[in-house]
Amino acid sequence: MLPIGQKFYTRTKHRIQQGKKTAGAWLQIGSPFTAEILGRAGFDWLMIDMEHGPGDIMTLIAQLQAMKGYGVDAFVRAPWNDFVTVKRILDAGANGVLIP
């Protein structure tokens, strides 16, 4: 939880605010190994697709853990528009959520 008044920044948001381009990749394979490989590839962000991909919340947690430490922002496309699901995605450690 952020202290009151502190803004939430990600590497991707910071680069966009500076007018710089970002590069990312879309993950539809529910594998932490793929997430780690792409996390190490130098992308600014990765989008984990839970809407059309095979992953559930446990797969997501494994993917986020595999990406951690490589400086890549992790965004997640939620499987549906449900606030409980969105909260679970954010609690798992995602930097942002795309809601279909």
Residue ranges and their predicted role:
Residues M1-P100:
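Expand to "…catalyze enediolate/carbanion chemistry for C-C bond making/breaking, isomerization
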